Amino acid sequence: MNRTVQKLLPWLTASAQDVEKVRNESIRLDPILMVAVLALLAWGLVMVTSASMELGERFGNPFFFVIRQTIAVVIGASITVWLVLRQPIALWVEYKLWILIASLLLLLVVLLPGIGHSVNGANRWIPLGPVNIQVSEFARLGLIIWMAGYIATHTIKLQNRITGMLGPGVVIFAASLLLLLQPDFGTTAVLAATLFAMAWLARAQWQMMVGSTLVMGVLGVFVVLSEQYRIERLLSFSNPFADPFGHGYQLANALIAIGTGGVWGRGLGESIQKLSYLPEAHTDFIFAVLAEELGLIGVIALIGLYGLIVWRGFVIANMAWKENQIAGAALAWGISVWIGMQALINMGVNMGVLPTKGLTLPLMSYGGSAMIVALISLGFLMRVHHEAAMVAELREAQMTKRQQDASIRTKEVLS
């Protein structure tokens, strides 16, 4: 316990009584964040049920997918409660190198013949009994944790030397290359943007940031132009109704769903497009089903909930930064940017603003790996809030004690 407190508060000394009092209290949860997360979780299960019942009939149970999704929620919540919330961020930072190695190995192993499982031409899954694990989800969280640890241990170097971004640049390039070999362009874009955003928020040298961004941009353009299907995606998303039964089929049906939803929607469970017209209605395109059933009002409410999560994430990051909890602040930045960016991209794809990326809507779309990782990530965010609040309380306790000691000494002098 003392070692943990020392890692959390290397600059602060507090009485053993104060430390024990604060440590024995329950985890300090952000109430607004908790409400937003629980609301999205409950809403997501309802929408998965609505969007997948027709497809579930093919497996002999209309609730086939929501049952599996509920199991993923239970697993993710259990890991969060019994592991993530109970361990200090300093512990994860201490093992950041091993987390980095494990993350890159996951991205490499999935490419090996006989290990990785291919779906629609993409090697993104590793079979594990009756389920398939999407390794990029876990690797992304691992890389965000590593980046947070790197920022915490190299803050001065990042802020004052151009070479400060060299290590992260190499890691981002290696991870992006492995992801593109799957291929998974959407996750590559989100991961690279998230890690760069973390460095930028930590005030990294802009010259290296610009250089790394240009290199990644050139690589991205090359990857897009190297495959005919990616070029066709770019062309079809700009006008899906030019080929509504070919490359534009999925987006055309998504736009029909969103358009027919209007302001108030058709009503929960009343979507027409989910009835085998819209592919991936319960996964990547669940937003279109939501817009059709709940209309513009539902869309605004959904955006509002994601906005609350991102806002609270940055508030928590600011709390941690002020209390000199650099790793916690960086981790909160990364998780907030990732969730907000992925939600915006998914909604943009559904509305035809962006080309199809194959990204799920966090906490809403069907997907066990994505759900488990999202809950674990939000658990880290809550842990950062707890530690920042704990440090603030210890600091205030120390200030109060100093004031009391000063008052006692003053009285003794006057007497």
From Swiss-Prot:
Transmembrane intervals: 31-51, 63-83, 97-117, 133-153, 162-182, 185-205, 206-226, 245-265, 285-305, 326-346, 361-381
Main location: membrane
Pathways per UniProt: Cell wall biogenesis; peptidoglycan biosynthesis
Broadest EC class assigned to this enzyme: transferase
GO MF, one example: lipid-linked peptidoglycan transporter activity
Compartments it resides in: Cell inner membrane
Membrane topology, record value: Multi-pass membrane protein
Keywords annotated in UniProt: Cell cycle, Cell division, Cell inner membrane, Cell membrane, Cell shape, Cell wall biogenesis/degradation, Glycosyltransferase, Membrane, Peptidoglycan synthesis, Transferase, Transmembrane, Transmembrane helix
Cystine bridges: none
Family: Belongs to the SEDS family. FtsW subfamily.
Name the record gives this protein: Probable peptidoglycan glycosyltransferase FtsW
